[in-house]
């Protein structure tokens, strides 16, 4: 929450405002109200790949010391700044990363030619390079594979921001848990 480099529009939260982070985690008793889905966790790949992806490191906390029957994963995306105001986090409404994904998807929807495929691939690879250490750009040769990669990236990039349901519905995909 400290960096505002990619924020286009946000709802700033100040001391005295409600804390969005409190909806996900409570300090008292370490109650995890919302644990990340295994489907989302699996999208980040192996434990080595997870460690290289800044989103996993900042969105999801793993604690192997939690008792049996308790989720070892917790959402930490909205824990807020490090100055003692836990859970007080600005709400990012539009970010550069989302714009890259929108443009990549739009390029493929407008045209199915090599230029659109190249432009969409570049947007996706640029976003991933900004998020993943040691990222190696991927080459996409067909629209369907690239669109699926964009949808998967939206799932990770926009986790806990309220986009997933609408992404599934606008694509007529099943809403499954």
Predicted features, each with a name:
Residues 1-25, 46-177:
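Acidic/polar-rich alpha-helix caps and helix-coil junctions
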Residues 31-45, 50:
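Short, cationic low-complexity segments
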């Amino acid at each position: 929450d400290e960096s505002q480099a990619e924020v286009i529009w946000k709802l700033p939260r100040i001391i005295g405002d409600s804390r969005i982070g409190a909806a996900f985690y409570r300090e008292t008793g370490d109650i995890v109200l919302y644990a990340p889905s295994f489907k989302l966790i699996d999208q980040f790949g192996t434990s080595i790949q997870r460690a290289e992806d800044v989103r996993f490191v900042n969105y999801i906390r793993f604690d192997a010391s939690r008792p049996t029957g308790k989720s070892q994963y917790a959402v930490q995306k909205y824990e807020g700044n490090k100055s003692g105001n836990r859970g007080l986090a600005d709400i990012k409404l539009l970010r550069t990363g989302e714009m890259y994904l929108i443009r990549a998807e739009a390029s493929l929807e407008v045209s199915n030619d090599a230029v659109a495929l190249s432009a969409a691939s570049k947007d996706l690879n640029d976003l991933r390079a900004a998020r993943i250490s040691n990222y190696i750009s991927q080459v996409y040769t067909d629209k369907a594979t690239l669109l699926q990669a964009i949808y998967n990236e939206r799932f990770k990039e926009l986790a806990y921001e309220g986009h997933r349901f609408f992404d599934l519905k606008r694509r007529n995909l099943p809403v499954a848990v």
